[in-house]
Amino acid sequence: MKFNAVVRTDLGKGASRRLRLTEKFPAIIYGGEAAPVAIELLHSDVINQMDKPEFYEGIILVIDGQEVAVKPQDIQRHVFKPKVEHMDFKRV
């Protein structure tokens, strides 16, 4: 399972809110030897795959042409809407 991701340069609460208005959501990749990376993902791509067990076993994120193997560590969902607010990924 592969998803395209973009590195975020604009960080913070306001930037995250603006990002969510464009049908994307913020996420972070951490773990391993590399430094943590803030990314953005397209909501429609991810939400359609979250009900499959393979999603939680490990996925591939394509960031600037480089593939990174990750596993979802934490998912923050909207209280009553079927939306993802933020995700944490751990490098595998």
Swiss-Prot record:
CDD domains: Ribosomal_L25_TL5_CTC. GO terms for biological process: translation. Signal peptide: none annotated. Keywords: Ribonucleoprotein, Ribosomal protein, RNA-binding, rRNA-binding. Belongs to the bacterial ribosomal protein bL25 family. The keyword Ribosomal protein applies. This is Large ribosomal subunit protein bL25. HAMAP family: Ribosomal_bL25. GO terms for cellular component: cytosolic large ribosomal subunit. Transmembrane segments: none annotated. It comes from Photobacterium profundum (strain SS9). Pfam families: Ribosomal_L25p. Part of the 50S ribosomal subunit; part of the 5S rRNA/L5/L18/L25 subcomplex. Contacts the 5S rRNA. Binds to the 5S rRNA independently of L5 and L18. This is one of the proteins that binds to the 5S RNA in the ribosome where it forms part of the central protuberance.
